[in-house]
């Protein structure tokens, strides 16, 4: 008991103070001026809005999605908004070779990379699971595995720039919901994998931040169509959501929560988990590992 009072409680107090107050660093749009940013899934919805915000802030932007025609319009508008440069590379994230080559091409177009924003998903609809293994496999490959491939391809450039990785995920990656089992599984995988390698980067002194964005229902056309007649709740605005994601990435926050309900943030931002992670991390030794 005496040890807890004299050692453990002060440490936990300092940890909690850091956890809650470090997020209040001021964001300034000029932080993005001249930065080199990739945005995937950028032909519509949150991805497109992020590209537009980045353009207004004077960033270099490379966007990707499947639709060449739509991406051309996005790039044209980015240039009108003031992007330092804007390019598109069309392709599907079902193709891991494309995913890897896309990052290399984007890096050449911009002359490097400061921020990798991963936002794409495969098409999904709300329904009960009916033994569709193909859909589960496709969801895991596009929504999860391609994120890993893109990250691996981008890491050499991000290490040079001390850059940032931003993962756009979902409340469905932290709380189980019916009728989206494959989608939810892929989002749980994202949260587990990128939370884990964030710890590894810290332990190995890799100065690349990872921001996991946990989103509720957002008013994108895709989401509204999927939940129509099934889920009755108000959606948050995609324009504001996109800006909060960018802010979180620039400020190198570990997690961003965005939902119309304050309860979502309060209940999911779990300080006890952070304390447990901190305590567990003290028991690791990397002396015997071969890099």
From Swiss-Prot:
Transmembrane region(s): 8-24
Assembly with partners or alone: Homodimer.
EC number: 1.1.1.146, 1.1.1.201
Primary location class: endoplasmic reticulum
Coiled coil: none
Pfam families assigned: adh_short
SUPFAM superfamilies registered for this protein in UniProt: NAD(P)-binding Rossmann-fold domains (SSF51735)
Protein's UniProt name: 11-beta-hydroxysteroid dehydrogenase 1
Cytoplasmic side: 1-7
Gene Ontology BP, a term: steroid catabolic process
Alphabetized CDD domains for the sequence: 11beta-HSD1_like_SDR_c
């Amino acid at each position: 008991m005496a040890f807890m009072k004299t050692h453990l409680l002060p440490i936990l107090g300092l940890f909690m103070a850091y956890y809650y107050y470090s997020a209040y660093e001021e964001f300034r749009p000029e932080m993005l001026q001249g930065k080199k940013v990739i945005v995937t899934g950028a032909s519509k919805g949150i991805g497109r809005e992020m590209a537009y915000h980045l353009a207004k802030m004077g960033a270099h932007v490379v966007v990707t999605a499947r639709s060449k025609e739509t991406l051309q319009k996005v790039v044209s508008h980015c240039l009108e908004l003031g992007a330092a440069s804007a390019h598109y590379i069309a392709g599907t994230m079902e193709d891991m070779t494309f995913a890897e080559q896309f990052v290399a091409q984007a890096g050449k177009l911009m002359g490097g990379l400061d921020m990798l924003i991963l936002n794409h998903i495969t098409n999904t609809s709300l329904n009960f699971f009916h033994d569709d293994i193909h859909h589960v496999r496709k969801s895991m490959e596009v929504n999860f595995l391609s994120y890993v491939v893109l990250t691996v391809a981008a890491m050499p450039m991000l290490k040079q720039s001390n850059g940032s990785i931003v993962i756009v995920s979902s409340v469905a990656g932290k709380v189980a919901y019916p009728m989206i089992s494959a989608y939810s599984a892929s989002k749980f995988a994202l949260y587990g994998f990128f939370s884990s390698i964030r710890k590894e980067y810290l332990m190995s002194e890799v100065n690349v931040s990872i921001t996991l964005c946990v989103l509720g229902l957002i008013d994108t056309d895709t989401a509204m169509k999927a939940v129509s007649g099934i889920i009755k709740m108000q959606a948050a605005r995609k324009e504001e959501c996109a800006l909060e994601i960018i802010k979180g990435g620039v400020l190198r926050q570990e997690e961003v929560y965005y939902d119309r309900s304050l309860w979502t943030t309060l209940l999911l931002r779990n300080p006890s988990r952070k304390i447990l992670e901190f305590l567990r991390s003290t028991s690791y030794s990397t002396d015997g590992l071969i890099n």
